[in-house]
Design a protein with these regions (language model features):
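Conserved AdoMet/S-adenosylmethionine-binding subsite of the radical SAM
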Residues: 1-94
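Auxiliary Fe-S-binding modules of radical SAM enzymes
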Residues: 60-135
């Protein structure tokens, strides 16, 4: 997450970008992430327009963005931005210990990790929208 003007200044020095988009819906994104997604989407679009190599990732999170409707909405957004590739990151519990070490409550405690085989139908929606989608 970075202001667009700073992103424009910085991108001339960057060849490869990893970026995550956690939700297509601005209100849901802001509620969970703490910021809306307008700036993130604007920066992603700008980077693609500059022909930068980008790995756009969706962390697929249970009860947040894991429904087939969510996949449809992401795919529609990506089609509108001419984005033709996305990596799915199935939810895992790797961060749980970090929260404990920081003395913070882990909101996802007890939530089952996802695996690629859990997301084949989700992945297929992107493929049906001509978006190369992989894990």
């Amino acid at each position: 997450f970075v202001e667009h003007e700073k992103f424009v200044d910085l991108i001339q020095y960057v060849d490869f970008i990893y970026t995550d988009l956690k939700h297509y819906n601005t209100l849901k994104h802001k509620r969970v992430v703490g910021v809306n997604n307008h700036l993130i989407i604007k920066n992603i679009h700008y980077a693609f327009a500059q022909n930068k190599t980008i790995v756009l990732r969706i962390p697929v999170i249970p009860n947040f963005n894991d429904s087939l409707n969510d996949a449809e909405e992401f795919a529609s957004l990506f089609n509108s931005l001419n984005i033709d590739e996305v990596q799915l990151l199935p939810f895992h519990q790797f961060g749980e210990n970090k929260y404990k070490l920081l003395g913070r409550r882990y909101e996802m405690e007890g939530i089952k990790a996802l695996h690629p085989e859990d997301l084949y139908d989700y992945q297929q929606i992107f493929l049906d929208h001509d978006i190369h989608c992989y894990f």
